[in-house]
Amino acid sequence: MNSLDFHRLLMEKVGFSLTTLQLRGFIVDMEIGVLEEEQGVTQRIRFDVDVFLNGADKPIEDEIDMVLDYDFIRSAISRIISNGRSNLLESLVADLLDALLIPVEVIGCSVSATKLDIYDGESEIGCSMLKLKE
């Protein structure tokens, strides 16, 4: 399923009213990778996250406790990383998706994790996953 298909399914699920919380370019140093040269060293990993909420209504009050606090995204990343080393970006991203889907307000999310330093030059490699709550 490509990103366009995912967004189409998302809109079918919620109608035409959707809020997206975003975290872009959140970079952490962490140990990850299966290759011998990746063992015992940290790499810069960039996270880009979209968290989808049903509805697009103005909060009843203009106060932080009326909305899902964006910091839960960064906290989820920190928690997943603190659980221990991952060999695969796919495992890391899947674990993060599951953590981000916990709040009742969340109906779906998209997570990308990108290794910034694995290749020389401008090349990057990464993994993206999209998931809707059932």
For the regions a language model picked out, list residue spans one by one.
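N-terminal, polar/charged subdomain of small-to-medium soluble alpha/beta proteins
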Residues: 2-134
